[in-house]
């Protein structure tokens, strides 16, 4: 699979307080394509970030119901992947920002 297809699998990284504490354990969270599978995600992360992946966990996140100006709507359903890296590898999302 080409690198362009790998970039289509990973939507965006999830950067919250909870995932920041997970990154200390070499675990990183991403929103991924709803048809993504564990093996293809493992190859995509290794190819894009040049790291060694130990394990990939995937979960489906159901969209919440929200009210906006009296109209009830739902957020989109998403798929989330939590990627565990090998011991000496890490991903730097900040990119050297000071």
From Swiss-Prot:
Matching InterPro entries: Nucleotide-bd_a/b_plait_sf (IPR012677), Ribosomal_uL23-like (IPR013025), Ribosomal_uL23/eL15/eS24_sf (IPR012678)
Highest taxon, organism lineage: Bacteria
GO biological process: translation
Keyword 4Fe-4S on entry: no
Matches recorded under SUPFAM superfamilies: Ribosomal proteins S24e, L23 and L15e
GO cellular component, one term: ribosome
Sorted UniProt keywords: Ribonucleoprotein, Ribosomal protein, RNA-binding, rRNA-binding
GO molecular function: rRNA binding; structural constituent of ribosome
Pfam families: Ribosomal_L23
Functional note: One of the early assembly proteins it binds 23S rRNA. One of the proteins that surrounds the polypeptide exit tunnel on the outside of the ribosome. Forms the main docking site for trigger factor binding to the ribosome.
PANTHER family in the record: 60S RIBOSOMAL PROTEIN L23A
Family listed: Belongs to the universal ribosomal protein uL23 family.
Assembly with partners or alone: Part of the 50S ribosomal subunit. Contacts protein L29, and trigger factor when it is bound to the ribosome.
Protein name as it appears in the record: Large ribosomal subunit protein uL23
Taxonomic path: Bacteria, Pseudomonadati, Pseudomonadota, Alphaproteobacteria, Rickettsiales
